[in-house]
């Protein structure tokens, strides 16, 4: 058994009530607010990108603001359904098989980013084909704004005191209410910074400085690669899901396994975009 590290300095957990507002029997959770805030701010930024013709191929945006207005419900459905189904398939299949009603108990389990990505991708393909939008351009505009949702979502994970990191003795380690007596890495904030803030800035630079939207698929590839690398890195500090644990040794996690093919897909998307541009 590995001994816990000696902890000389820790940060107190900011004990924020997961329920932001209660109106009678209705409880509004920070997690729900984070989802709504991420979608709405992403929608606002996406509308700005769609209105800026000079960023797109032939200086003409293939996506209108009305398209984005119509896509909000599609995106929400893809995120929630894909995220929940993905969590069940990747992390909680045994428990759901034993108690099927658990599948709809979103509060008793969680959501999977990888599942949400698959669900949103399906929604984007169907929406783009229905509205005559180039699929790669649809992917690009959503990829450009997705880190905003990730930023808010990971902060909400921290407020909820969930998905905490491994035991640590760094000065910024935190004792989480549900994480036992030892201080842990605030891995949710690591993810918020890398998958959220850093990635949205990198994508903005790619779009506004290097005109990445003019080569459809480039922004998508950068996002997918960036997320995958960030997630793999943070997995070294994040506690694996208790019902799965480590898949091999004392280091390989499900998050790493799911993110590795993501990186390869992102790299393929970037190379495909460059090849298509050269042959055009």
From Swiss-Prot:
Membrane topology annotation: Multi-pass membrane protein
Annotated transmembrane regions: 26-46, 71-91, 106-126, 132-152, 193-213, 217-237, 251-271
Pathway noted in the entry: Protein modification; lipoprotein biosynthesis (diacylglyceryl transfer)
Pfam families for this protein: LGT
GO molecular function: phosphatidylglycerol-prolipoprotein diacylglyceryl transferase activity
GO biological process: lipoprotein biosynthetic process
EC annotation from Swiss-Prot or TrEMBL: 2.5.1.145
One cellular-component annotation, GO: plasma membrane
Keywords, in A-Z order: Cell inner membrane, Cell membrane, Membrane, Transferase, Transmembrane, Transmembrane helix
Compartments, record wording: Cell inner membrane
Binding site for a 1,2-diacyl-sn-glycero-3-phospho-(1'-sn-glycerol): 154
Family: Belongs to the Lgt family.
PANTHER family the UniProt entry points to: PHOSPHATIDYLGLYCEROL--PROLIPOPROTEIN DIACYLGLYCERYL TRANSFERASE (PTHR30589:SF0), PROLIPOPROTEIN DIACYLGLYCERYL TRANSFERASE (PTHR30589)
Record function comment: Catalyzes the transfer of the diacylglyceryl group from phosphatidylglycerol to the sulfhydryl group of the N-terminal cysteine of a prolipoprotein, the first step in the formation of mature lipoproteins.
Protein name per its UniProtKB record: Phosphatidylglycerol--prolipoprotein diacylglyceryl transferase
Record organism: Agrobacterium fabrum (strain C58 / ATCC 33970) (Agrobacterium tumefaciens (strain C58))
Gene: lgt
